[in-house]
Every structure is written in structure tokens, then in C-alpha cells.
């Protein structure tokens, strides 16, 4: 697509950020392996979304958290250049989600407003209740994120893993009752839900729709496989 003067229209950046729980409980029942498989599988879908959208340049970042938040992919990276390095869960690691959200908010502060970027898309995956061994509560971290312009306008989706996932906190992170909150109870569900959430978030962020639910459509059915993670906790 080009403008009237014959110059190509520049793609606007769409920052796509995964916030991933790598706490000790992710070692149970093959959860961390399933999470790695899910991210590996979702990347080709995101590349397809990027190729199909002439208006957005999809830039990926990944933030992992356990006892502390650490960037796995810190620099905004075009999706076709992302090569996934498998995550390792932290044995006996806590779930410092509040600290992770503060780290995320700090990164969003650095976005260049001159580019008129699309709202960021943020997908949070966690299997536990937020801890605060760093002294930062979930509520404090979330408020820091929402006080940030980009954090407040971001398309925020969340996915719980297993029965111990704190769905109340994940719902607060989403902030919109019309946006589906999903819980995966086995590896198959985790892959399918992350693929759905990633495709939905990238579409909504780059093609804003006014109205309840942000126009992202219905999630996949939850009757996939046996609920092994709800049995394990």
C-alpha cells in the first residue's frame, strides 16, 4: 500500500509482549515444557499475522518471572527474527508478578510516542498466586502498569495454568469483563489457548474495535484432553 505521493506507507510498530511465569510450580506435570512448546508453535501464527497486516510491524518481547523478573527477549524484535530459546523453571521459585509488572511498565515508558504506535498486546501466563518476596505486591505492580499510558491502553490477555492459578488476579490484569479469561488444564489446552490469545491480541491491537470484548471473538472450547493439571494442582 502506498500514499498519494507514491511513497510506501510505513508500518506502525505493534509491541507484542509475553509475560511468562517460570516459578517452581511450573516444573509440575510438564508445564514448563508445554509452555515452551506453545511459544514455539505460536510464532509461525504470529508471522502469518504480521505478513497479512500491511499496517503493523509486529515486534516481540518476552519477560519471564519467578523470584525476579528477567527479560528473555528485551529488545523489540521483528517476529520473523525471533528464534525461541527454551525457558527453564526456577526450582522453588516464587511468583513475583507484581515486580514483573513494574519491570514491564518501565519498559513501556521507553516506547517512542512519535511513531504513533498501535497499543501494545500483552499476554500473561501464570499457574500460581502472586507472591511479594521482593516487597512489591501484585496490586502495586498492576497499578504501576495502569498508570503508564501504554500499559493502560494495551490489549491485555491472561491465561491461568492448572487449578492453583489465581484467576481473580488474572482477571484484574485483563481489566475488561468482556475479554475471555482462560485456564489450561493440560498441555493441549495450553498450546491452543496461547495460539488463540496471541492471534486475537495482535488483531485487536492493530485493528481497534469499539465495544464490549474488543471484537476478539470466542475462544476455543475447553473440552480438550484430560484435566491433568487440575488434578496435580
Named regions from a protein language model:
Residues 1-233:
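Acidic, low-complexity intrinsically disordered regions
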